[in-house]
Amino acid sequence: MAAGMKAKRSRRRKERKNVEHGCAHIKSTFNNSIVTITDSVGNTLSWASAGGLGFRGSRKSTPFAAQMAAETAAKAAMEHGLKSIEVYVKGPGSGREAAIRSLQAAGLEVTLIKDVTPIPHNGCRPPKRRRV
C-alpha cells in the first residue's frame, strides 16, 4: 500500500429485524434506571439508561430521567416494527411507573405488566442503615 493510505474497513451494517411483539425490561434502582427492549426470544432490539442520556448524580434516579430513557428505547425499537410489548419491572426505584407510562405514550401497546423484583429468602446480609 502507498504511504499515508489507510486500509478501508468494511463494517457490516446492522440489519433491521421486523418484530411485532417484544418485551421491555425496566430495571429501576435507587441510583439509575435502565430500559431494555427485546424480542420475544430475548435478543436486544434497543436499550437506554438515565445515565447514558446525560443525567448525572442524583438526577439519574428521578422519574423524569426514567421517562426519557424509556422514550428513547421505545423510539429505537419501533424502527424494528415493534407494536406491542410485555413489561417486566425490576427494582425499588422511583422511575418504575414513569417508564411504563412513557412506553405507552410512545405508541406501544402494553399487553402485560409484571414485577420481577428478586426477593431474597434470607440470603445476603443487606447494607447497613444510613446515618445522616
UniProtKB/Swiss-Prot annotation:
Keywords, comma-separated and alphabetical: Ribonucleoprotein, Ribosomal protein, RNA-binding, rRNA-binding
Annotated GO CC locations: ribonucleoprotein complex; ribosome
Gene3D superfamilies in the cross-refs: Ribosomal protein S11
A Pfam short name: Ribosomal_S11
GO molecular function terms listed in the Swiss-Prot or TrEMBL record: rRNA binding; structural constituent of ribosome
GO biological process: translation
UniProt family annotation: Belongs to the universal ribosomal protein uS11 family.
UniProt subunit comment: Part of the 30S ribosomal subunit. Interacts with proteins S7 and S18. Binds to IF-3.
Function text: Located on the platform of the 30S subunit, it bridges several disparate RNA helices of the 16S rRNA. Forms part of the Shine-Dalgarno cleft in the 70S ribosome.
Name of this chain's protein: Small ribosomal subunit protein uS11
The gene coding this protein: rpsK
